């Protein structure tokens, strides 16, 4: 229920990567549930627009923090900006997702993925999760990906960082059972977001499950928090991935997913 969610995970939610895509949708839906919001992103003007939109549609207080999660000191900025704010819900959604063959990507790009996709979520969970644990209530949503469960050509490093988020969240789900703090890893398949469109996939060549939409993906994530350690949004995606993992040897699974990526991103 609306009130139940607010009393369990309020009064403030912090969402990273909130300036577009899934992060924006999280901001909208969490705002609609009556929680105040701290929205974090590197893109200042887009972030300001999202904040304004959510203030208008939900009437909740919205605070924005512009920072780069690949910076070693990003937490100092966040700590300063959230002083005196009780964050009861953390949505670790920001990610750096370049697509390309491993040896065609710069080392700098690959290391940045680890900074934004692994190091930053770890620090955020360590920081905000500890205070939730002390208060005996709260929620943590970590965005993983359908790519986290097997090797995926063209996003080798990215998929590996998403596996880190999946395993971290599932482990914390178990460690924190009964503590009042809920943890969930969300594993969406390809989702129709600006970020995905910017990767320029040749969608017309592909035969796999249809693209997810951000709205139902986020709604499912908010609904499943506290019910399960990890979740694949979208019934068709869930069935496809679960069945394929049960029926196919790992080698075949990697090749199947890889052939789809080659259709999308191959020359």
PLM regions: where:
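Canonical Rossmann dinucleotide-binding motif of NAD(H)/NADP(H)-dependent dehydrogenases/reductases
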Residues: 1-37
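Conserved glycine-rich Rossmann-like NAD(P)H-binding loop of the short-chain dehydrogenase/reductase
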Residues: 35-49
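Conserved NAD(P)H cofactor-binding loop of Rossmann-fold oxidoreductase domains
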Residues: 93-99
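Substrate-binding pocket helix/loop in short-chain dehydrogenase/reductase
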Residues: 101-114
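Active-site helix of classical SDR
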Residues: 125, 161
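Residue(s) in the substrate-gating loop at a strand-loop-helix junction
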Residues: 145
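C-terminal helical subdomain
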Residues: 185, 204-242
